[in-house]
């Protein structure tokens, strides 16, 4: 059944019904069917229902692996020395990117985001930065919350960080399928492509195949991923869930699950105990397809293993 966004989605006050003018082209609706699971698993149907790429020279669009300090210790995104450790770890591992999540604008303890980007560039590691989508934040007093939703501010910010050498952006908290927010996705991707920025859409809707038109879109969350493992009931069902999503969610597009977590995630002081094996976690790095494969655990968790 085709449904409009829920009225209860309060992020933006817009009506749930879309508005347009004629000629009006409605989206494709597709069903993927195959005689075997491999046919479904390997399909690119959703991508192929989109217009061809508008990016001429795409040699700068490179998939890769990333480290990420936020999952285990959120406050570390503001700590310069911690982020430098992650850059060094990436360099040693041969991973291409490091993601600095929310809070990097207030970085201290010896340096700034700009300093991390410069150092990472010398090590051959590309830096990604987190941004709020701006959904529902038009009147927010925090200016950084509007950097992606306001076209003028967005382009200025993208130009600024591109000049610094930032390689990608993770845009988060879209939080609704109302028309204005759906239209924000291609607007962000288009501007990001102009400034040679890769994109991860987090807290976002189910993939729509935008990556064919804008191949700088590397991945989309839209999955109950590792961020939810702070609850024991999620850990208890993780093995079953992880064995299912390659044939459901991952079929329609790259999946930002943030896998390979060996540590027990602590939420409000209470650890949720991992119920999957080390082998299971390692397999997720291969089984889950994502152009930006962000490994979520702390450095020590990876270094402690053989």
Model-derived segments and their meaning:
Residues 1-47:
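N-terminal accessory beta-strand-rich subdomains and adjacent acidic, glycine-rich linkers
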Residues 38-43, 48, 54-58, 75-77:
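Conserved mixed alpha/beta catalytic, RNA-binding, or beta-rich assembly cores of soluble enzyme
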Residues 48-69, 91-96:
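Feature activates predominantly on carbohydrate-active enzymes
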Residues 65-82, 139-153:
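Active-site mouth loops of central-metabolism enzymes
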Residues 80-103, 160-167:
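Catalytic domains of carbohydrate-active enzymes, especially glycoside hydrolases
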């Amino acid at each position: 059944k085709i449904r409009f966004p829920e009225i209860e989605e309060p992020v933006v006050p817009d009506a749930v019904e879309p508005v347009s003018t004629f000629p009006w082209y409605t989206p494709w609706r597709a069903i993927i069917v195959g005689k075997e699971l491999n046919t479904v698993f390997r399909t690119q149907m959703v991508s192929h229902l989109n217009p061809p790429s508008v990016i001429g020279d795409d040699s700068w669009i490179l998939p890769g692996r990333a480290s990420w300090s936020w999952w285990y210790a959120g406050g570390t995104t503001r700590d310069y020395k911690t982020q430098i450790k992650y850059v060094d770890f990436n360099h040693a591992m041969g991973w291409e990117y490091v993601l600095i999540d929310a809070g990097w604008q207030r970085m201290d303890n010896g340096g700034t985001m700009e300093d991390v980007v410069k150092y990472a560039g010398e090590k051959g590691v590309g830096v990604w930065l987190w941004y709020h989508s701006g959904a529902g934040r038009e009147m927010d007093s925090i200016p950084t919350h509007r950097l992606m939703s306001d076209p003028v501010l967005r382009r200025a910010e993208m130009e600024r960080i591109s000049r610094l050498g930032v390689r990608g952006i993770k845009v988060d908290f879209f939080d609704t399928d109302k028309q204005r927010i759906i239209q924000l996705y291609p607007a962000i991707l288009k501007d990001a492509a102009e400034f040679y920025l890769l994109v991860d859409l987090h807290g976002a809707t189910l993939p729509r195949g935008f990556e064919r038109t804008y191949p700088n879109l590397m991945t989309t969350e839209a999955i109950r991923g590792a961020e939810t493992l702070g609850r024991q009931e999620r850990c208890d069902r993780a093995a079953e869930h992880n064995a299912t999503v390659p044939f459901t969610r991952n079929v329609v597009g790259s999946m930002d699950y943030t896998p390979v977590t060996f540590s027990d995630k602590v939420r409000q002081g209470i650890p949720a105990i991992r119920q999957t094996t080390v082998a299971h976690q390692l397999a997720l790095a291969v089984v889950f397809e994502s152009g930006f494969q962000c490994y979520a655990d702390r450095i020590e968790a990876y270094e402690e293993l053989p």
